Amino acid sequence: MEYPNDESLRVSHETIYRSLFIQARGALKQELVRHLRSKRRIRRSRHSSVHGHSRGQIVDAISIRERPAEVADRAIPGHWEGDLLRGARNSHVATLVERHSRFCMRVKVPGKDTATVVAALSQHVRQLPATLRRSLTWDRGLEMAQHKRFTMATDVQVYFCDPQSPWQRGSNENTNGLLRQYLPKNVDLSTFSQSELDAIALRLNQRPRQTLGFQTPASKLQASVASTP
C-alpha cells in the first residue's frame, strides 16, 4: 500500500470487486477468473434470492442496496424506475420513469406473467439510445422474474427494492399518481392501445414540474442527452 496512513486513499475489497464486475457488465473475463478463489465468472449478490419462484422469490435478484451511487443523486440520465399499474378486470400497464428528468413511458402489456412483461419492456427500452439505458429499479413483483432475460436484451441492469418499500421508487410512485387522472383504477386498461398510452405519456412529459424548476420532463431529458458525451 503506497499511502498506509491516509484513509482517504484507501479502497475496500468490495469497491475493487464491484468496479471489475461493473466494467465487465456483471461477468469477469476469463483471465481474471483464474485469480479468484471461487473461480466464479458471474458474481451473485449477497442480498440476492436463491429460492425458486414457488416461494414467491426472484432468483438472483440484485438488491437496490447495490445500485451505483450515481443512481441515487439523479445527476446522470438513464436510470429508470418501473412498476405495473393495475386497472379493472386484472388489466395492467407497465410504467417507466427516468429518475433524472422524470420522463415517463407507458407500455401496453397483454398479461402480467413475466415472459409477457419482460418482452414488452425489452421492446420499448431497446429503442432508447445507449446513454439512456443504464439501470432499472423495480419492486419485488414476479412480473420481473425473468430480469436476466431483460438485461441480456437491453444491456440494462435491474435492481430490486426491499419488500414493502414503495418509497424506494419515489419518482415512479409519484408519476403513477399523476397517471391516474387518465387511467383510473376502475377502467379496463387493456382497452387502451399503445398509441393512446403514448399520447397520455406525452401529456405528462410536456407538463412543467415544480421539482424540475418548472421545466418539462421532455425538455429536461432532451437537454441532458444533448450534453452527455
Language model segments and positions:
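Mobile-element integrase/transposase regions
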Residues: 37-94
